[in-house]
Design a protein with these regions (language model features):
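Short, positively charged, Gly/Tyr-enriched micro-motifs
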Residues: 95-182
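Residues immediately flanking
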Residues: 174, 236, 260, 377
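RNase H-like nuclease fold core
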Residues: 145-232, 238, 242-243, 250
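Long C-terminal interaction/binding lobes of large macromolecular proteins
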Residues: 24-47, 212, 217-219, 250, ...
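Short, conserved DNA-binding cores of transcription-related domains
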Residues: 2-106, 354, 365, 369
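Short small-residue beta-strand/loop micro-motif enriched in glycine and branched aliphatics
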Residues: 98-101, 194-199, 353-357
Length: 423
């Protein structure tokens, strides 16, 4: 316990605005296991028939412009990492060259889905990399890089496959993380049960948070250039609210009622009648009823004796009544930050298991983004006595999956790195 803490110097500043597409954005991932690969891959006629059928059922996997025609222009050299595996090349009639990769093969030929399925599932639950290395071989950096490579994909584009299913109501918050011996902030954006934005920044002021949440704005606008969410639920941190207003001026910010309750509960934990009355106010069905219940609640607690910190928290709840009532103007919005809090809790456990973040800003952020994709696509725990309707949070959001295997589904959804491209 007396050992001196050692932290290496790392770059904590976010890089400037990126204009180009990331690595892997020119690679199309096709739903295909090894058996179908051996049967179809070397047969040009069979491959073209397969692609034509796939274009009809899943056009979002391909760049716009492919409907005007394409040619299969041969194979790439055989992989040295995976003997017997060769990628194919596809050339569009109107220009543009893409690589075809079967979904059972990982990017960079780093392995196959069957090899890394269970290890990645363990990593998504925060199992330390040294444990995974001991059980499945390779080394710690191999498994860390697998997760980081997933983080290069568009988090929004990979998770949301249909622009019509982009959530209109979001929840956002910052998680305080230990980062190279100092404090860092992971800006999280959640919607429809999925993590749609994760960005790492060194400060939580207006400029840093606008830049961090701006990653979500850029990725979602790649899917739908006109997209503007209706609401976002945040806590009372002004920099968070200012950042979202700066990114989406027409957005309505909903103040989290849960945070107001927690400030009171933390100061007086055993007064269950007080707690019940607060939630009775929250459960009001209309804005008028909410205002009436809030006034009645204030009249009740003003006639009682409270400790100074409790009374101060109650006054703050009353002073924010108009911000809380805004939620009634937007049916379907998140009135509490419960959605993002649940996902933050999972992130907290992963970071705790790894004792925080230890890399540069870019690599640490990619690791968080890769973990978020694993979280969105990993299978739900089985229920006792009844099968689940959906395989994963992403399946529930899209009402569609490309493959019965969760990691195949993630690989295919990350076709062209999750970006929509036109030629």
């Amino acid at each position: 316990m007396d050992a001196r803490q050692r932290t290496r110097t790392c770059v904590r500043t976010r890089a400037g605005q990126k204009t180009g597409l990331p690595r892997g954005a020119r690679q199309i991932c096709l739903p295909m296991d090894r058996e179908n690969y051996d049967r179809l891959w070397s047969d040009a006629a069979a491959m073209r028939q397969y692609l034509d059928e796939l274009l009809k059922s899943c056009p979002e996997l391909f760049p716009t412009g492919i409907e005007h025609g394409f040619q299969l222009t041969g194979h790439l050299p055989e992989s040295k990492k995976l003997p017997g595996i060769r990628l194919r090349q596809l050339r569009l009639t109107k220009g543009g060259v893409f690589t075809l990769r079967p979904s059972f093969v990982l990017t960079y030929m780093a392995g196959t889905v069957d090899d890394v399925d269970y290890p990645l599932l363990l990593l998504s639950f925060g199992v330390p990399t040294w444990v995974v290395t001991r059980g499945f071989g390779h080394n710690d950096m191999y498994w860390q890089r697998l997760v980081e490579r997933l983080g290069r994909n568009s988090l929004v584009g990979t998770t949301v496959r249909d622009p019509k299913r982009l959530p209109q109501h979001l929840a956002a918050d910052e998680h305080h993380a230990a980062w190279c011996g100092e404090k860092g902030y992971a800006a999280l954006t959640a919607g429809a049960g999925c993590l749609l934005g994760v960005a790492l920044t060194e400060a939580a002021d207006d400029d840093h948070l606008r830049d961090a949440y701006g990653t979500f704005r850029d990725e979602v606008r790649n899917i739908d250039p006109t997209y503007t969410p209706k609401t976002v639920n945040t806590d009372g941190w002004k920099a968070t609210q200012n950042a979202w207003h700066g990114l989406f001026p027409l957005l309505a910010v909903i103040l989290c009622f849960l945070h107001g309750f927690l400030k009171i509960r933390d100061r007086i934990r055993k007064d269950h009648e007080l707690h019940r009355r607060i939630w009775d106010v929250y459960r009001a069905a209309t804005r008028i009823e909410f205002a009436k219940r809030m006034r009645d609640f204030r009249h009740w607690w003003q006639g009682k004796s409270w400790a100074g910190p409790v009374r101060e928290a109650l006054e703050k709840l009353w002073n924010h009544r108009r911000e809380y009532a805004t939620s009634y103007q937007h049916p379907g919005c998140h009135r509490t930050s419960n959605l993002v809090d649940r996902l933050t809790n999972r992130l907290y456990r992963v970071l705790y298991a790894g004792r925080g973040l230890h890399g540069h800003q870019a690599s640490s952020e990619r690791r968080l983004r890769g973990w978020a994709l694993l979280l969105n696509f990993r299978p739900y725990a089985p229920r006792s006595g009844e099968p689940r309707t959906h395989q994963s949070p992403a399946h529930r959001l899209n009402h569609k999956k490309y493959h019965d295997h969760w990691l195949h589904n993630l690989q295919i959804s990350a076709s062209m790195a999750g970006y929509r491209q036109s030629t």
